[in-house]
């Protein structure tokens, strides 16, 4: 099954890597949601965003739409961190069932890549939120492509050595490193 990718609301992003084009189904690359009804457009794009494994955003041309998309991603990561903490002391089988259901509904980790050729002009609040999400910042699409290909190859490699019953469990990885900045304080 191909991974899913999401390009934020910009027309300036494109890939040259055939690996990225063949192994990731991108929303926003060759097609866009031309729906005129604002609610339908929001729901369609948000559904694609929620179920994506990879998100690429152009911060050089930051729009309110891109800011909203990145805010949704942060909200999902925060919700996942809360859920992970709530169920951290349950048995292994229950944890895997909960992770499966969470992933099915978009509560999962995703790789985020941001094109930003001038980090000094980026709003510090936005930069802080993206840093909490372990975002990869790049000066060019070439850098993003290289990092994305490496991440994709890593995911393909670990999936070969991990047995997963698709209908029951999801990959149980160590997510502490990725979500430590989102840990809920007492």
Tell where the protein language model's regions lie, with residue ranges.
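Conserved catalytic or regulatory cores that recognize and/or transform ribose-phosphate-containing ligands
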Residues: 1-186
């Amino acid at each position: 099954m191909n991974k899913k990718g999401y390009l934020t609301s910009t027309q300036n992003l494109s890939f040259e890597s055939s690996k990225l084009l063949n192994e990731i189904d991108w929303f926003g690359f060759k097609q866009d949601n031309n729906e005129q009804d604002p609610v339908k457009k929001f729901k369609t794009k948000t559904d694609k965003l929620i179920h994506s494994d990879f998100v690429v955003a152009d911060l050089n041309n930051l729009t309110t739409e891109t800011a909203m998309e990145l805010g949704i991603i942060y909200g999902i990561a925060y919700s996942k961190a809360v859920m992970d903490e709530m169920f951290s002391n349950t048995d292994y089988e229950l944890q895997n069932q909960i992770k499966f259901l969470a992933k099915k509904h978009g509560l999962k980790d995703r790789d985020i890549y941001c094109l930003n050729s001038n980090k000094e002009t980026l709003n510090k609040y936005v930069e802080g939120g993206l840093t909490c999400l372990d975002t990869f910042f790049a000066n060019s699409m070439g850098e993003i492509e290289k990092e994305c290909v490496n991440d994709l190859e890593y995911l393909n490699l670990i999936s070969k050595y991990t047995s997963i019953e698709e209908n029951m469990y999801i990959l149980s990885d160590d997510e502490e490193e990725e979500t430590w900045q989102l840990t809920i304080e007492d």
